[in-house]
Amino acid sequence: MRCEWEGCQEEIGDNVRGHLLSHIEKDEEARCLWKDCARYGEAQASKHALLAHARRHTGERPFECHLCGKDYTRSDPLKKHLLRHEAVDSKNENLIRKIEYLGQLLAEYRRESLRIMNDIESIRYNIQAMSRKIAYETKGNKSSL
């Protein structure tokens, strides 16, 4: 990439920050002198602010989120972004706890359902056994009449 700072046409290599600092250090007023910049000649609050502004021109985004890879020209938006990850993590933890609780309720429901089904099956078996006994005894009483 070619540097568009006033009076410079150098190719900027890997050391973008160092090259920008060489221009910024020369200007006591911390003004952006990048060709065609909407803020050309405006003084920034500090040299650090000017460096952050100049990254817009170079595309340098040195502050990267280690969780998702999103990158920024300054550290403060990255910090704000990381807080969103923490909020999502906290929300996810709450959801996971709720899901685990629902899983426990479901397991308890299944155990209780099986117990009830076994009770019903046992009652059905007893009714059938009693029906057979009554039928047998009733047959025996008819023959003695």
From Swiss-Prot:
Zinc finger C2H2-type: from-to: 35-57, 63-85
Keyword annotations of the record: Metal-binding, Repeat, Zinc, Zinc-finger
SUPFAM superfamilies: beta-beta-alpha zinc fingers
Top-rank taxon, per record: Eukaryota
One GO CC annotation: nucleus
InterPro entries: GLI_C2H2-zinc-finger (IPR050329), Znf-C2H2_ZIC1-5/GLI1-3-like (IPR056436), Znf_C2H2_sf (IPR036236), Znf_C2H2_type (IPR013087)
One GO MF term attached to the UniProt entry: DNA-binding transcription factor activity, RNA polymerase II-specific
Name of protein: Zinc finger C2H2 protein ECU06_1150
Native organism: Encephalitozoon cuniculi (strain GB-M1) (Microsporidian parasite)
